[in-house]
């Protein structure tokens, strides 16, 4: 497995000290390492993957150095616009390194919403002309691939990608964070909201734990799931799904949990 500290240090030797992206479970150990070791002003958790690409572009314009952009492969679609119309060598030619978690890799067990994206991830990189490598699962070859792809990015003035398989990074113990002063956790919050809603309210819940906890609340209380739409994919788009429902059915109240 890949040592997160050695990989982080290798990025520094390549001149990469700015990080932007959208967290991914496959990259969790490395993202935690970034959070613990990069200064606050050099690490931005972006609103979406396209915004992360733009942040990396701005960093390069100001410093002349490439940045690292991390994301799940499900976010590649959000990143395509700035990749091909801003950073591409035929436009502004902005070097950057993408670290892409490979959910839904063919032949690897995963959730259904990841199957299609996993199958097309390498082909999507090919289609937009972005050089990529599958990141090796051991530290030394991973660092060698990292250095080679950064060299390509800088010499050719273009985005490049390293695609990361599941369980590539070794576990990392994140530094302890100050205890939250909030007394209501996410599970209790979801239950509190769901309990207070009238029975005619349609509910759209976002990707991840919020949808899981809404589902579990309905099951535990013996309620049906018919008025809930659990957004298992399309991270970041739950609010617009809810808006689409509300515009089409203005007589029915719609709540979005995001």
Label the predicted regions.
Residues 257-258:
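Glycine- and Gly-Pro-enriched alpha-helical subdomains that act as flexible
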């Amino acid at each position: 497995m890949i040592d997160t500290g050695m990989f982080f240090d290798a990025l520094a030797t390549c001149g990469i000290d700015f990080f932007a992206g959208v967290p991914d479970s496959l990259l969790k150990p490395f993202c935690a390492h970034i959070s613990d070791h990069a200064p606050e002003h050099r690490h931005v958790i972006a609103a979406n993957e396209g915004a992360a690409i733009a942040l990396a572009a701005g960093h390069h314009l100001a410093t002349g150095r490439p940045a690292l952009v991390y994301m799940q492969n499900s976010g590649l679609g959000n990143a395509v616009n700035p990749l091909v119309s801003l950073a591409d060598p035929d436009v502004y030619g902005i070097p950057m390194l993408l670290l892409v978690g490979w959910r839904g890799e063919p032949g690897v067990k995963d959730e259904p919403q990841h199957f299609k994206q996993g199958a097309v991830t390498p082909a999507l990189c090919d289609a937009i002309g972005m050089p990529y490598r599958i990141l090796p699962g051991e530290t030394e070859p991973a660092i060698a691939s990292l250095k080679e792809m950064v060299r390509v990015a800088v010499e050719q003035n273009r985005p490049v990608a390293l695609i990361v398989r599941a369980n590539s990074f070794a576990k990392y113990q994140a530094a302890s964070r100050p205890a939250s002063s909030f007394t209501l956790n996410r599970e209790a919050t979801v239950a509190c909201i769901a309990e207070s809603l009238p029975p005619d309210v349609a509910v759209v819940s976002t990707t991840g734990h919020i949808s899981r906890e809404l589902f579990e609340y309905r099951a535990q209380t013996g309620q049906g799931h018919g008025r809930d739409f659990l957004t298992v994919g399309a991270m970041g788009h739950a609010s617009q799904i809810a808006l689409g429902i509300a515009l089409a059915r203005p007589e029915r109240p719609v709540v979005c949990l995001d």
